[in-house]
């Protein structure tokens, strides 16, 4: 009887353990934004955490920054690095730093900071993200 109780408790605990393991990688909607006043509130060259966007570095591909939806901010706070994996657009795969926050209407989303000449190339799609240490 004791073995059955232990087995039952182990089976009941599986969802909790697997959720704990899989929360490291989640699927989110990704879009792209440019540092222009029509797409940002306040100064478009200053992110929510106070970081300054260098347009030259952005154009050269040296800045790999994202904005994250507010519901994910606790799990992925400003300054965190995330690995982005896209099956549809593998060219965007890589490690990005979180420096900005999306508007309140967005959930389970990231917004990749892109130079005006590049962001429109991909459109909205789903990606997998996980925190990088």
Functional labels for PLM-detected ranges:
Residues 4-12:
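Sec-dependent N-terminal signal peptides
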Residues 12-20:
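Short hydrophobic alpha-helical membrane-anchoring segments
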Residues 19-133:
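Solvent-exposed, well-ordered loop and adjacent helix/strand elements within mature globular domains
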